[in-house]
Amino acid sequence: MTVRIGVVGTGAIGRDHARRINKVLGGAKIVALSDVNRASAEAVKNDIAPDAVLFATGEELIASPDVEAVLVTSWGATHEQYVLAAIAAGKPCFCEKPLATTAEGARRIVDAEVAHGKRLVQVGFMRRYDAGYVALKQAVDNRIGAPIMVHAAHRNPSVPEQYVTPMAIHDTMIHEIDVLRWLLDDDYVSARVLFPRSAARSHAKLKDPQIVILETAKGTIIDVEIFVNCHYGYDIQCQVVGEDGIASLPEPMSVQTRLGARLQNDILTDWKDRFIASYDVELQDFIHAAAKGTASGPNSWDGYVAAISSDACVAAQETQGAAVAIDLPARPALYQ
């Protein structure tokens, strides 16, 4: 069976996902495209999906009987409306993060999916599909005993001037917020944010670096360093301290050289290079589930919890180190 997929939003990530589906993965084909910039959709049609039909709006694409599943890769503020339309149409939907730009919007999606009675939404938290994180989770679940502490870091070489302090949470740490919750199988109960002295490469509207301290319901303490102007490379670190041992996220594969009296490994500089393979795996997972009329992987509840947790972290940026509670409602049975 070939799943007929429509793409709403043909910017950089939408174009890349369309390429993946038509050129790399199996079991699916791009049959429809829509973007507010018609020229963008036309370019994807010409370069990647020549048989695709162009639609004036995302809603028209979703309603088309020729479309069996939907990719929402449009501007973040539009995600909610398109995901809700896909649920109303009963069509599996892959939505890039964020699920919605507010926790209230994410909750509306959860409520709509629960009312529908079947999982239809997969959220694009691709780190769960990274081979290193999968191996780390196996170690956490089976080898090192109950987790006590987690030390994590998310470092970028640089960010543009328009990147401001809250974006360190909503745009950057959002990945840690999801993947660490999945890694520990535990929910957060509070967040604190500490600010060291700002790095010289920061700017007036960005406090960088920052340290976020999360506490979980089971009592695990997590510290996450966010340093988006580290200069030296793109570097993701994660170490879980358990009762019986320690497990660390593997480093990306790199050629080690012994040259000029130095032992060296290269460090990546681009997030796309670090996690490119996980995008293939997550979309293949979506295709397999969509062929059965459902969805798997990170779900709407995960997107909702990430929104609540990130909002709490942003609030904690203003409390001079005081903890902010993360209050989660009961999880619906659909997501148990």
Swiss-Prot record:
Gene Ontology BP, a term: inositol catabolic process
First-tier enzyme category under EC: oxidoreductase
Record's keyword annotation contains rRNA-binding: no
Record keyword Oxidoreductase present: yes
GO molecular function, one term: inositol 2-dehydrogenase (NAD+) activity
Keywords tagged on the record: NAD, Oxidoreductase
Catalytic reactions of this protein: myo-inositol + NAD(+) = scyllo-inosose + NADH + H(+)
InterPro entries associated with the record: Gfo-Idh-MocA_inositol_DH, Gfo/Idh/MocA-like_OxRdtase_C, Gfo/Idh/MocA-like_OxRdtase_N, MI/DCI_dehydrogenase, NAD(P)-bd_dom_sf
Enzyme Commission number(s) of this protein: 1.1.1.18
Function: Involved in the oxidation of myo-inositol (MI) to 2-keto-myo-inositol (2KMI or 2-inosose).
Similarity section: Belongs to the Gfo/Idh/MocA family.
Subunit: Homotetramer.
HAMAP family for the chain: IolG
UniProt-recorded name of the protein: Inositol 2-dehydrogenase
Originating species: Agrobacterium fabrum (strain C58 / ATCC 33970) (Agrobacterium tumefaciens (strain C58))
